[in-house]
Amino acid sequence: TSTRPAESLYTGRSVQDAKWVAQKLDAKLMFASTGLGLIGSEQPCPAYNLTVASEPNSIRPWLGKLGLHPSDWWDAINNHWQRPNPIAALAKRADIKHILIALSANYVDLVANDLAQIATNDRPKLRLFTSRPGIERLPEHFRSLAMPYDERLESSRLAGTRADFPQRSMRHFVELIAAPTDSSSA
């Protein structure tokens, strides 16, 4: 089976915006992969077609028949690769000061258990970018970490689709924090 770097398998505007953010911040780009768990953008991956979103290739119907949730799948796939709670493990690292996470509501469902494992003192490192439904699906004590983006982003130059909203809002946030300020008008 041939493999390619993860960043070449995932395409579309959402990935382009996430790549832009990683490059701008000189940060590591990672993907929440339904099939492979949390993976770095350079990780070799086989082509596959699996999602937690409401699409024909979704794992949701299969999980539902088993009485399981997407977060159970995330736990199992990461345990299979011997990387339990990989987001919590990153948050625990002292050398990592900031973690920006952009996920759709469906992918919030996927990583919810992992997020819940993040220690209280590591949570301030996080900034979460998701939709209003995504915020509602976050573990309750993480909702305050969700950046307050809403449909007003659609009237900006970063207008787009619901599917790429989390990554567009993350890009907007980074553009704002990275922009030089004019101290005379501040």
Regions found by a protein language model. Give the residues of each.
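A glycine-rich, hydrophobic loop/mini-helix early in the fold
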Residues: 1-52
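Flexible, charged surface loops at secondary-structure boundaries
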Residues: 22-26, 89-99, 119-123
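Long, charge-dense
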Residues: 35-89
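Short catalytic/ligand-binding loop motif for oxyanion handling, primarily in non-cytosolic enzymes
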Residues: 38-42, 108-111, 136-138
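A short, acidic, amphipathic alpha-helical segment used as a generic capping/interface helix at domain edges
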Residues: 79-92, 106-118
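Structural motif
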Residues: 102-106, 130-132
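C-terminal accessory extensions appended to soluble enzyme cores
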Residues: 123-125, 130-186
